[in-house]
């Protein structure tokens, strides 16, 4: 007779005498861009792709278009003018490369703004690249020749310092002002400088990090790159990427492909939330400079950048209660006046009294009471 098989239960196995404790569930809260993030919206129409491009703003504006009246410099800066001394440095506005930016208006998602939850667009990923790098192969132009003695060889191609930055966000890019020399006299007409924002002349702190020298990139071609930089202390609702390569004869190095995707989600899996259905794109792409043959004048060269952004819908908690919206509506209906100061350092308010309920008549009409930071009522005893 064949031997019987023993039971499959191992003698070494120990059974749990009681159920293992489970961690208590707690609410999970994510805050992004000032919004309380809820769940994703599902459905076939929840994902949108947008393609756009930004042209460079190197100093020369898009107009005039005539190639004999300034249009030939579009995509370039005008000739860089040097300082005549340490205290006399006043660059022309058309020699300063500036930030390119644009706002894309997305389809409206919410018809009823009184609900507790709203839908918002969320930027998930972006494909981007600099367009036109092949144009830098032009070595037959009227630039400084490589053989300066016999005026032969080839035309010196674009080379020098390069700066590449792009940003995608649900709000304008936050900028921090910082300059090389606070004595530089930037012209305020046509560009936004630190003095434009602070209403004061630049100080030595503007050569490092001055907390008051901050701005938002709200205008295209107005914020010089050498003054304004992405603010790492802010930009919670924006993703920016960049690199800088310095040098006077550094050759441009560019990689381009339509297969590289940059994910815009943070460590919590949340991308920039587009407030007011607005998507903001920003970039700077400086390739270096060209040197003209006649006067050895240097001109910055910039190239355009292409964007392909993928967006999806998200449910968020309505951050604006109906009561505050109605209150804001009534407040905006009131006329704006400019009177004497009743707030701040120069306030002309003498005294404020607050009454609540009733009490027996106090024996001291000048009695002083106040509420401390713990919410307790205190009475000041009269001094001698």
Curated annotation (Swiss-Prot):
Keywords assigned by UniProt, alphabetized: Capsid protein, Caveolin-mediated endocytosis of virus by host, Disulfide bond, Host nucleus, Host-virus interaction, Late protein, Phosphoprotein, T=7 icosahedral capsid protein, Viral attachment to host cell, Viral penetration into host cytoplasm, Virion, Virus endocytosis by host, Virus entry into host cell
Any single Pfam family the record assigns to this protein: Polyoma_coat
Positions bearing Phosphothreonine: 358
Location within or outside the cell: Virion; Host nucleus
GO BP, one annotated term: caveolin-mediated endocytosis of virus by host cell
GO molecular function: structural molecule activity
Cellular component, GO, one term: T=7 icosahedral viral capsid
Transmembrane regions: none
Domain of life the protein comes from: Viruses
Motif (Bipartite nuclear localization signal): 4-18
Region (C-terminal arm): 322-384
Keyword Chaperone: no
Functional note: Forms an icosahedral capsid with a T=7 symmetry and a 40 nm diameter. The capsid is composed of 72 pentamers linked to each other by disulfide bonds and associated with VP2 or VP3 proteins. Interacts with terminal alpha(2,3)-linked sialic acids on the cell surface to provide virion attachment to target cell. This attachment induces virion internalization predominantly through caveolin-mediated endocytosis. Once attached, the virion is internalized by caveolin-mediated endocytosis and traffics to the endoplasmic reticulum.
Domain notes: A DNA-binding domain overlapping a bipartite nuclear localization signal is present in the N-terminal region of the protein and is required for efficient virus formation. The intrinsically disordered C-terminal arm interacts with neighboring pentamers. The unstructured nature of this region allows to make different interactions depending on the structural context: pentamers present at the 12 icosahedral fivefold axes bind five pentamers, whereas pentamers present at the 60 icosahedral six-fold axes interact with six pentamers.
Quaternary structure and partners: Homomultimer; disulfide-linked. The virus capsid is composed of 72 icosahedral units, each one composed of five disulfide-linked copies of VP1. Interacts with minor capsid proteins VP2 and VP3.
Family listed: Belongs to the polyomaviruses coat protein VP1 family.
Protein name per UniProt: Capsid protein VP1
